[in-house]
Amino acid sequence: MTRLSRMLSSLTPRRGKPDMSIVVVVHNIPREAPRTLFSLSRGYQRHICATDYEVIVVDNGSDPPLDRRVIEETFGPNFRLIRLDAAPPSPAHAVNRGLAEARGEIVGVMIDGARLVTPGLLHFARQGARLYDRAIVATLGWYLGHDFQRWAMTAGYDTKDEDALLSSIDWPQNGYRLFEVATLDESSVDGWLMPVTESNALFLRRELWTELGGLDERFDAPGGGLLNLDTYRRALELPDTEPVLLLGEGTFHQLHGGVATNVAVGCLAESLARWNAHYES
């Protein structure tokens, strides 16, 4: 049994615990994180009560750090912040820390806290997880903007343009209008009814996360490298699992200088070669 498995197994059920936990990792994204967290709040999410879920925000060494009081007072008592001061560059340990703290029966992981979500994500993820005893609930991934962000940036696309896009759809008044100003990302580029290569909001029952052993902390590159793809693959390879893809919901990536999503094409090719070599080793 892994250290994470022991930590998860040692947590005893608490009276009044939430049905769901969502672990969100943030690192140096002061512009994007508040939007992401608002999109997970009861003021935005539909068909779900604040007592039904908790959001565990893991600050993976941000400088300056997120303010615990601001997080909990702004977004509600079902939000809590965990701060990792001596944080490794990969988000793997941060996710595992969040998993160990999670109290819900269904646990979602958002490895990149710069992603907005649609208003029915939590409701339908909960319903999807209940379709099968061993459901793997995934979402399509999108970029804000009308091209892959690394290509759009070469034409001058920046955070001001992204802010204008969100204003043009009056976000967050109707979160489903995000689909109007977004492009499917590489994980989902084959389209609505095709398999995805990773999910930036991945929901499993608690015991499946335990069986999986959490995220593999050997993925120690900044940003995690192929960590998220590996996690999704390993989840699907667990015995007797059933994939569930939420077609009407999604996650939407904001510009923030991500090591994979917002780097020049040439730099990405170098990184992919390095990450693949690391993965094969």
Q: What role is predicted for each listed range?
A:
Residues 7, 29-45:
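Short, well-formed alpha-helical segments that are part of the catalytic scaffolds
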Residues 57-68, 115:
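A conserved acidic beta->alpha catalytic loop
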Residues 85-102:
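Glycine-rich, basic loop-to-helix element that forms the pyrophosphate-binding segment
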Residues 107:
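Short aromatic/hydrophobic "clamp" motif used to bind/position activated sugar donors
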Residues 120-168:
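Conserved donor NDP-sugar-binding/catalytic core segment of glycosyltransferases
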Residues 142-144, 245-263:
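Active-site donor/metal-binding and catalytic loop motifs
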Residues 167-204:
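A recurrent flexible, glycine/aromatic-enriched loop bordering the glycosyltransferase active site
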Residues 195-204, 208-213, 219-240:
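A short, conserved alpha-helix in the catalytic core of glycosyltransferases
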